Regions:
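Catalytic cores of nucleotide-sugar-dependent glycosyltransferases that transfer UDP/GDP/TDP-activated
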Residues: 1-345
């Protein structure tokens, strides 16, 4: 498409890209860089400690950090700063679920909003108020199906920088669970599947709040096999190493997760994914080709059987699948189509 002037308005709580955990910020970082590389005039509104190939503007010199996440004051200040000169841009791309969306609806300029989260009652009420005045992008068809009445500019999968992920054909003798300790993320299911299959588990887990801590300490750890390796939150480099060496990644979620980046990250490393069919899983994992989608009803037996079959999965097929569907380039092309629709519509 012809070059457009794009304002990328990131959430204000973490740097872009983030220093650690922060899926939205990773996506924004890749998108801002990818659009710039494609010849678009991109301005990223984020915190001053962000790094980007786009032009960077900020109010807050440093990200306030995870403790401030969902704090509306930071969000409102950054949003109003980004919107102060609307004529400078052809399209605003908003990534925060709060004030950015509401402000974008009264800009008089095309506003695209990516639905990074789930549709809880508060978000549903907000989206209902502006559903005809902003363009929405879902990050999976499963997410879109939960609120089909919105004004969609399309479905665009979250992309990753595939060449940055180490591809490894030969694997070590462990399976990996990587994620938060929240019950819906499925750490306990991962433990049970590894036990049933008789394989060693490595669990790299972030404990984010008291409820997660309670679940982790009272439900998961007492069932953890003695030969398991239990890690806390890992660095980006450690994550990539763990993903590339694992025989498989377990993703046994128990909620309608709109998109799970760890699945694409694992497959980019040539590592198959074994997951339950919730949220975007059936769209992301090619069952029998890049991993196995196993039923909740027959868990953990079916997951254990799948773990014994991971040798049937070609690591090169996993990598090729991600390059085709979930690369940075595929994501940029998807958003270019969304912007074209928003600007022309």
């Amino acid at each position: 498409m012809p070059s457009v002037r794009v304002a990328q308005v990131s959430p204000p709580w973490l740097a872009v890209p983030p220093k650690g955990y922060g899926g939205i910020e990773w996506v924004v970082a890749l998108l801002a860089d990818g659009l710039t590389e494609s010849g678009h005039d991109v301005t990223l509104f984020a915190t001053g400690d962000s790094t980007t190939k786009a032009k960077l503007e900020y109010v807050f010199a440093e990200a306030p950090g995870p403790a401030a996440i969902n704090d509306i004051w930071h969000d409102s200040v950054q949003t109003m700063y980004a919107l102060r000169n609307p004529d400078d841009f052809d399209v605003f791309h908003l990534h925060s679920p709060f004030s950015a969306l509401a402000a974008g609806a009264v800009l008089g300029r095309p506003a695209v909003h990516t639905l990074h989260g789930s549709f809880n009652p508060h978000m549903r009420l907000l989206y209902e108020q502006v559903k005809d005045r902003a363009w929405f992008v879902a990050i999976s068809q499963a997410q879109r199906d939960h609120m089909p009445e919105l004004n969609y500019a399309g479905v665009v999968y979250n992309g990753i920088d595939v060449p940055a992920y180490p591809f490894r054909k030969e694997k070590d003798d462990y399976v990996l669970f990587l994620g938060r300790a929240a019950p819906e993320k499925g750490a306990l299911r991962a433990v049970l599947a590894a036990q049933a299959a008789g394989v060693r588990l490595v669990a790299a887990v972030k404990v984010a709040d008291p409820l997660e801590k309670e679940h982790w300490e009272q439900e998961v750890l007492p069932n953890m096999p003695k030969d398991a390796t239990v890690l806390g939150e890992v660095t980006i480099e450690e994550k990539m190493d763990l993903l590339s060496r694992a025989r498989a990644v377990l993703f046994p979620i128990d909620w309608e997760e709109p998109f799970g980046l760890v699945m694409t990250e694992a497959m980019a490393c040539g590592t198959p994914v074994i997951a339950t069919p919730r949220g975007s899983v059936p769209e992301v994992v090619a069952d029998g080709r890049t991993g196995f989608v196993v039923s909740v009803e027959s868990y953990p037996e079916e997951a254990a059987a799948a773990l014994k079959r991971v040798g049937e999965i070609d690591p090169a097929a996993c990598r090729a699948w991600v390059e085709e569907k979930f690369s940075k380039e595929a994501m940029v092309a998807g958003y270019e189509r969304a912007y074209e629709l928003a600007v022309s519509g």
